[in-house]
Design a protein with these regions (language model features):
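N-terminal, positively charged/glycine-rich alpha-helical extensions of SAM-dependent methyltransferases
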Residues: 1-22
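Conserved alpha-helix/loop element of class I SAM-dependent methyltransferases that forms part
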Residues: 15-23, 29-50
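A short acidic, Gly/Pro-enriched loop at the edge of an enzyme's catalytic core
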Residues: 110-121
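A short glycine-rich, Lys/Arg-flanked "PGG" loop and its adjoining helix->strand segment in the class I
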Residues: 135-150
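Short, glycine-/aromatic-enriched active-site segment of Class I SAM-dependent methyltransferases
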Residues: 157-179
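Conserved Class I S-adenosyl-L-methionine
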Residues: 201-262
Length: 262
């Protein structure tokens, strides 16, 4: 999905491939500002010191990793399952003059190609919902982050049970958006604990992230003509429909989590 859709998506949404954070719960700031703000909200939940090495799980095209490196003066290794994303992220690091500090590789979060305790901290910015086995990915993170190291996660959740036609919407999000691990905050916390992590904070920021759904649908509708040639009419319309329906579902939520390796 990301091999084919990253470029068209980034063209209309911006290269931060994640939801925005609007403090007021209404879209009173541009998308680019709100997506940077979401990165900053996650940054605020990361404990890492200058010179330390942080793993970025599901790095997209590298924008959050570069912000992390610049803000905290850390080294970052980003991984993604998408080779074109890794190539773009590496080019961005090069352009930013940070290619020694920030590197990107192809890799699968559920089977990390790193030794035990290789990192001081890790974050996953809107990537763990893609995991077919979230506990397995979290166990891998626990393994590669040293004892005492920090983990920060931003991700989609459902704030309650879903009934009737809304179940089809969630199914469409799973199928079309690759959202394989979708559940409540309690499910997330249970998965973190099952992976052996100490949970520090689980904050429901559904209200602050929700304008993203409206904005996403709006941008995709407005830019439909630019998206169709690369993504295809069927895919674009399916995406718009799913976003509009999710926007009508009060259970469509978002969480910020922080944890520590014991
Ligand atoms: C919604 S994007 C977020 C990208 C980036 N964190 C950002 O905020 O700009 C999800 C990312 O997760 C990556 N991803 C999906 N499944 C993965 C897996 N099994 N292992 C590693 N990365 C994965 C995708 O390639 C993509 O980069």
């Amino acid at each position: 999905m990301y091999d084919d859709h990253t470029d068209p998506f980034a063209r209309v949404w911006g290269a931060n491939l994640h939801f925005g954070y609007w403090e007021s719960g209404v879209a009173d700031a541009p998308i680019a500002e709100a997506t940077e703000r979401m990165t900053d909200e996650l940054l605020a939940r990361m404990s890492c010191s200058p010179g330390e090495h942080v793993l970025d799980v599901g790095c997209g095209v590298g924008v959050p990793a570069l912000r992390l490196a610049r803000t905290r003066h850390v080294r970052v290794t980003g991984i993604s399952t998408s080779a074109p994303q890794v190539a773009q992220a590496s080019a961005r690091a090069e352009e930013a003059g940070l290619s020694d500090e920030v590197v990107f590789h192809c890799g699968d979060a559920m089977e990390l190609d790193f030794t035990d305790d290789a990192f001081d901290a890790a974050w996953a910015l809107e990537s763990l919902h893609h995991m077919s086995d979230r506990v397995r990915a979290l166990r891998e993170l626990r393994r590669v982050v040293r004892p005492g190291g920090s983990l920060a996660v931003a991700d989609f959740i459902l704030t309650g049970p879903v009934h009737g036609p809304d179940r089809h919407t969630v199914e469409a999000f799973r199928e079309g958006g690759g959202a394989h691990s979708l559940g409540t905050i309690e499910d997330y916390v249970a998965d973190l604990r099952q992976a052996g992590l100490d949970v520090i904070e689980a904050l429901d920021v559904s209200t602050q992230a929700r304008p993203s759904l409206t904005k996403h649908a709006e941008v995709f509708r407005d830019e439909r003509h630019r998206l169709v040639p690369t993504m295809g009419e069927r895919e674009v319309d399916r995406m718009i429909r799913t976003l509009e329906r999710l926007d009508e579902m009060p259970q469509a939520g978002y969480v910020l989590l922080s944890a520590q390796v014991p």
